[in-house]
Amino acid sequence: MRPINRYPSVDYLHKAARKKLPKFSYDYVDGGSGAGVGLDRNRAALDEITLTPRYITDWKPVEMAVELFGQRYSRPFGIAPMGLAGLQYPKAELKFARAGKKANIPTSLSTACTVDIEDFGAIAGENGWFQLYPPKSEEINDDLIDRAYN
């Protein structure tokens, strides 16, 4: 069965993750930062959106491509960085990179990644972005930037 049929909504994915992942790993993914205020606000805003199908009406294909920082992407969204993604699935960031490249959307790698920056970059290519949490050490900071840039 195709994943889209097994998991018709995010709620189904949520329940499957709770069953499959170790508790510490699930809690990391499921929670927000701090008191979770941002997570609560995002959920409330999304709950206000209603998608209304319009049957038996004329329709035209929608062009969803967008240019951002001089590069053309197929969609106006990308794959956000997730720290310690490898705790959820081995080499998850590399899977994200492949999916982002295939879909031609930006894909971000967190400073708290579980794969080599260079391996991610080799797969993501121009679609790869790097989310830098600057360390106190200027030397380490410069090294991270150099590795992400090259």
Where do the PLM segments sit?
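Conserved, mostly hydrophobic/aromatic
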Residues: 22, 79, 100
